[in-house]
């Protein structure tokens, strides 16, 4: 209790603090572009940026420039999350949070589904082709076609697109990716 002295007045401000332990565990992961339909990852520079992690229709995390995400605190239980990327084919991930933090590791994703349908077709190619051969700063450069983020839309990026060209994604499974 604070008391007044030497002509000063004192005011008591009641405060509360919740010092109970956290009720959940962090869940982390990294989203990378798939290199092919076999499920091979394209590599560490092919990160999927600004990919939302959605649980129960709520965005709980978003990937950063390194493709990494952190869901800060989930209580123990089973979860189904959707990786939702504006130019990719959505992926569902199921995981169980137990009594410690959980790292989901590297998760592959198809990143060249520009029109968000279940096909990698001429509509997607038109988006890629419009940016092909360009570099950052040029009017026709599209950063979403620069899959490895090196500032150029070139053969490295085309190899990734062409691996999925013509794919009917409605029958594609992320099971082993």
Q: Can you annotate each of these PLM segments?
A:
Residues 4-6, 134:
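Extracellular acidic, Ser/Thr/Pro-rich low-complexity tracts
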Residues 1-2, 83:
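Hydrophobic/tyrosine-rich beta-strand signature of extracellular beta-sandwich/beta-rich modules
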Residues 23-46, 51-54, 59-177:
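Cellulosome-associated attachment modules in secreted, modular CAZymes
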Residues 7-22:
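Extracellular fibronectin type III
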